[in-house]
Every structure is written in structure tokens, then in C-alpha cells.
């Protein structure tokens, strides 16, 4: 199944009218949803995809016959269960390198597995909770879970996320930036020193990847941030391809994984704000990650081999 047609549902996140209808029919037929998984089938060059962030995949549904004698729970119970199980499922999806554009679709499975586990979910008025409302809750908790991952990022990057959500790469007032910096335990001057912020004439803005210095060396960066890692990787990937990006990943070592995690959060922000160009860059980096990682490992092994040969040669002489 491949569908992406969002509908804004004020106060309860974003739902998908196509999924509402389809899942309701599956459940009515007596099935429960136990999983969803994206399979790369959709063509980026099809007419409806030109100029848009279309799904990269169709979605495989894993279904089982529902237990009609299952328990009845309340909406509050469902929220508690989703907050317990969905974060674990999200980590699994990210580790499997699901494309950010497919993340919301992939999360439907674990969320609906909880919803269809029970005979009924009752709202505050004692009425059955609809599939539409269940999907809204799943999307809401997915957003909350991604926001909670911000705790893995450094203070400068948390500031950049908050600023980017409001202004993107556009200019904003220095005073607003300074107030936000205090809340994030950093400073505008420090952010400028970090190398990704420009401050001039009472205005500040985050530098675009193409504006970042081409001679950047993470090993010499005294204020290395997750934000810099992501955007330098995008710069290198777009200008030099996967091979050059792999060289940078090899330099970053284990820190690179946190940069990949940040891409998911940034993609979600861009999609919500309808910033298609930026969203495309974050999605492309994650989709290229397996090949970049493979090339980085190959480069590391080659360097180790060369070092061993050099050492043996020195011993011989």
C-alpha cells in the first residue's frame, strides 16, 4: 500500500485520510495490525513526485486475526501503552535505516498493533475510539518521541533546532536568538564561534550547508556540534558524493551516528513547515548512509593495512 495525503487535525497531530479508510476496512474484516514495513518501490521521477517529497516506498502490512475476546481499555490506557512501546519501535526503525520520508508510515504498524490488540478503546464519553483518532495519537506520540531524542544532542545543536523550526535558514532578530540561547544553556557568541551561525547588524541566521567552510576538520574543531556534522556531511555529499562523505564519517567515528539521528528530527521539522528542499537533503543523507558507512569502513581498513605494511617495512630495514 502506498498513500500520502495528510490532513491537519488541530491539537492532535496529523492524520492520513487514506490510511483511515484502509485500516478501518482491514480491522472491520477481523484483522489486527501487527506491523508495517516500507519496501522501496516508488519512483522518484513519476509525475506526482516531481517537486515534492513523495514516499520512497510502498508499505507492507503484517496482519493477524483479532482476538475478539480481548480486553476493553480507555483512551488514557492506549496513550500509556503507546508511550511505552512506540519509542522502542522508533529506535528499531531508525537502526534499520528507514528513510525519514517513510518514518511516519513505518510507525503506523507498531502503533496500530497496540490499538488493535484490544477489543475496543473507549474515549472519555464511553464511545469507541475511531481509527482516525488512533492515528492522530500515534503521530502525536511519534513527534513527542522525536523531540525527546533532542536530549542526545549538544546544547548548541538544541538551540539550532529550536531556531531552525521557527526561522529555517532565514534571518531573525539578535534579541530573540539571545533569549533562546539562555534557555538552551549557550550564547550567540558561542554559536558564532561554533562556526554555523552568522551575527551582523542585529540579525542572526544559520549558515546553509553550501556556506560552510570547505576546509573544516572535525578533529581540530574545539566546539564540535551535532548540527555541524549533519550540515557538513550534506555539503560534502552534495558536492563530492558518497566517497567524500565517507571520508568525513571516518573522521567523525562514533559521533557520526548521532548526526544521523538528528537528520530524522530535522526532516520532521521541514515536512511540517513545508520546506521541501531542506527535507530532501536530510532524507538523502539518511538514505545514503549504508553506502557511506561501508565506504568509511573500507577506507579505515585500507589505512590500517597501509600502516601495518609501513611498520613491517621499517622493522625489516
Predicted segments with their positions:
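C-terminal accessory/interaction regions of large nucleic acid-associated machines
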Residues: 92-317
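Generic structural hydrophobic/aromatic packing signal, biased to beta-strands
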Residues: 33, 59-63, 111
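Conserved Class I SAM-dependent methyltransferase catalytic core
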Residues: 1-34
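Short, contiguous acidic/charged loop-to-helix segments that flank catalytic cores in large enzymes
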Residues: 5-17, 49-54, 96, 217, ...
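Residue-level marker of positions within ordered structural domains that often coincide
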Residues: 31, 68, 116
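Flexible loop/turn segments at secondary-structure boundaries
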Residues: 4-10, 36, 40-46, 68-71
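Flexible, glycine-/basic-rich loop-and-beta segments that form/coincide
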Residues: 46-98
